[in-house]
Amino acid sequence: MKIYLVGGAVRDALLGLPVKDKDWVVVGATPQEMLDAGYQQVGRDFPVFLHPQTREEYALARTERKSGSGYTGFTCYAAPDVTLEEDLQRRDLTINALAQDDDGHIVDPYQGRRDLDNRLLRHVSPAFSEDPLRVLRVARFAARYAHLSFRIADETLALMRDMTAAGELEHLTPERVWKETENALTTRNPQVFFQVLRDCGALRVLFPEVDALFGVPAPAKWHPEIDTGIHTLMTLSMAAMLSPNVDVRFATLCHDLGKGLTPKALWPRHHGHGPAGVKLVEQLCQRLRVPNEIRDLAKLVAEFHDLIHTFPILQPKTIVKLFDSIDAWRKPQRVEQIALTSEADVRGRTGFEASDYPQGRWLREAWLVAQAVPTKEVVEAGFKGAEIREELTRRRIAAVANWKERRCPKPEA
């Protein structure tokens, strides 16, 4: 029996990055030998065991053979005669097909170290095309390592295009698509994930609402980048700089979906694109089974982001109504989330990346003022039932009006 550290732990250590999770491959062992050694079996489809002390995963070396459609259509063979090289060959990318033995020696049968040095994401074998989930995984790795200047090998991108054209992505479940997307949204450069999907044709299949934005122009005065798809990815990039929050990043991705519905005759203007985009956000989230909290924020951002931009001319009544509409009284975090997405929208434009966004500060300040109006005083004043809400709203409007007069500059005539 020989045990090897494999995959991401070896890859990240060679890149000088922190190693989070460790996975191990066991060569030359049987399931019974693992059980006798105190390991706990957890794998149903193939033998995976948990170490009795560390609880890290140890998998018996195995091969995989395509036996059906999609990413689940595989037959696994795990036995003592499966070699380490055979196990590594089934992996997606050469940089993930690395192993390390007890002495620290790196086993590299598929030139993974060379590709690490060359910052290249390259598939191990033609079997890559048997698993459509790998299209999303490669896009996610491209986003994860974009800051290290990794790129996808031409032949790998060509294979991803072929897989997409062959309809392989249609076998992916919504849950797996969302999980990969969610993981990609946590990376330093989530916009790269969606750009790669577009490069291989997968964006049109999995995110048609986002893909439809490319080629849709916006007024050059406000959007020097002109193309709404490009603006969307720039905005997502900016959101990633402003917040680690997946909710904020996903909402930013969806903020301009309504522009994809504007008739060409009306281009480059997109009047009413915010409310129009809400249905598309709902459609996308329902299809991918996006968690409700993330979906709800994305819908609110689509509807109200342009309103935030006009903050200096908003009436106090409108500001308080906005807080009502986003349910800020029960979910105050939404004020900060919407301020950040609106800022990302403004700064996600060519030449505006370093722009100040005072509207975000004013929104936060107005919220603190409105929130500070005590409900207790309204009740103690004798108001009852529906009157309480009406009076509380009136006082909030008055407080915001007083603050706005002092703190928020009046727009130029």
From Swiss-Prot:
Cofactor(s) required for function per UniProt: Mg(2+); Ni(2+)
Residue sites binding CTP per the record: 8, 11, 91, 137, 140
Note: A single active site specifically recognizes both ATP and CTP and is responsible for their addition.
Cofactor: how bound: Magnesium is required for nucleotidyltransferase activity. Nickel for phosphatase activity.
Family affiliation: Belongs to the tRNA nucleotidyltransferase/poly(A) polymerase family. Bacterial CCA-adding enzyme type 1 subfamily.
One of the GO BP terms on file: RNA repair
Quaternary structure, from the entry: Monomer. Can also form homodimers and oligomers.
Domain notes: Comprises two domains: an N-terminal domain containing the nucleotidyltransferase activity and a C-terminal HD domain associated with both phosphodiesterase and phosphatase activities.
Record bears the keyword ATP-binding: yes
Organism field: Citrobacter koseri (strain ATCC BAA-895 / CDC 4225-83 / SGSC4696)
Sequence positions that bind Mg(2+): 21, 23
Designated name of the protein: Multifunctional CCA protein
Taxonomy, superkingdom: Bacteria
Swiss-Prot/TrEMBL catalytic activity: a tRNA precursor + 2 CTP + ATP = a tRNA with a 3' CCA end + 3 diphosphate; a tRNA with a 3' CCA end + 2 CTP + ATP = a tRNA with a 3' CCACCA end + 3 diphosphate
One MF term in the entry's GO annotations: CCA tRNA nucleotidyltransferase activity
Chain ranges of the HD domain: 228-329
Gene name in the database record: cca
Binding site for ATP: 8, 11, 91, 137, 140
Function: Catalyzes the addition and repair of the essential 3'-terminal CCA sequence in tRNAs without using a nucleic acid template. Adds these three nucleotides in the order of C, C, and A to the tRNA nucleotide-73, using CTP and ATP as substrates and producing inorganic pyrophosphate. tRNA 3'-terminal CCA addition is required both for tRNA processing and repair. Also involved in tRNA surveillance by mediating tandem CCA addition to generate a CCACCA at the 3' terminus of unstable tRNAs. While stable tRNAs receive only 3'-terminal CCA, unstable tRNAs are marked with CCACCA and rapidly degraded.
